[in-house]
């Protein structure tokens, strides 16, 4: 094996990490300390159908016009389109084979989690969502609530919500020296959402892998996605 490429999670260098983020960071460190040169890409929320973090945004925004939420909805995150993540992963083979390090990767937008939900609402043709931050809503309670109002399994919701207690933004842009961004730039958040939804001009609102508007697009749902990925939109709210 000549090179390991691992996709980890963005996380602050100092402070307490959730078990989920700490585990991903530990896996990256194991690879970096191995005898095989390793590139560890650290990304925040990946925007594309099937991404658990994106699917949680999708389901909560579609179902709830009014939403009690933990204080982490005010935290800053730097989402990245799945096609940009795949581009980095594929072009990692062009990086000096002796290089052994982490790289932060993220899209051009730094948003609060609540802003991401309302950005999704705009692209989905839904009214703006009203989000109330409640300091007493713990991550555990929030995950129970998410699993009740959405098809996201509790065992998926718990680590995602716990990891959102930290700001997840890019702290360095060294990757640009090795893999320059595309000429048109990395995809903005709302553009990435639009691609993930694959909405048709005629008003088709439900996306399936059989009827995706761009065949083979990385933002499209896949047959291997879990049952809760890529559900249609709720227009009643």
Residue ranges and their predicted role:
Residues 10-11, 45, 135:
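Conserved beta-strand edge residues that scaffold enzyme active sites
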Residues 91-159, 170-237:
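Mid/C-terminal beta-alpha module of Rossmann-like enzyme folds, strongest
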Residues 15-124, 148-151:
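Oxidoreductase cofactor-interface core, primarily capturing Rossmann-like NAD(P)-dependent enzymes
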Residues 4-9, 41-43:
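SDR active-site strand-loop-helix element
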Residues 1, 9-16:
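NAD(P)H-binding glycine-rich loop region in Rossmannoid oxidoreductase-like domains
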């Amino acid at each position: 094996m000549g090179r390991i490429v691992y996709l980890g999670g963005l996380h602050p260098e100092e402070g307490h990490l959730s078990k989920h983020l700490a585990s991903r960071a530990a896996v990256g460190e194991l690879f970096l300390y191995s005898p095989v040169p390793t590139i560890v890409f650290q990304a925040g929320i990946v925007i594309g159908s099937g991404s658990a973090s994106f699917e949680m945004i999708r389901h909560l925004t579609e179902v709830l016009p009014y939403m009690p939420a933990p204080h982490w909805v005010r935290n800053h995150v730097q989402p990245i389109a799945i096609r940009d993540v795949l581009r980095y992963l594929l072009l990692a083979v062009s990086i000096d084979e002796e290089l052994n390090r982490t790289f932060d990767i993220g899209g051009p937008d730094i948003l609060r989690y609540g802003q991401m939900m309302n950005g999704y609402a705009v692209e989905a043709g839904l009214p703006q969502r009203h989000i109330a931050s409640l300091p007493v809503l713990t991550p555990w309670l929030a995950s129970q609530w998410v699993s009740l109002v959405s098809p996201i399994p509790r065992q998926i919701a718990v680590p995602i919500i716990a990891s959102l207690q930290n700001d997840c933004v890019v702290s360095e842009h060294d990757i640009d020296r090795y893999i320059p961004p595309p000429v048109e730039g990395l995809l903005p958040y709302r553009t990435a959402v639009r691609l993930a939804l694959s909405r048709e001009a005629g008003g088709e609102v439900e996306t399936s892998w059989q009827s995706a508007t761009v065949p083979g697009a990385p933002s499209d749902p896949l047959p291997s996605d879990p049952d809760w990925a890529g559900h249609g939109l709720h227009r009643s709210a």
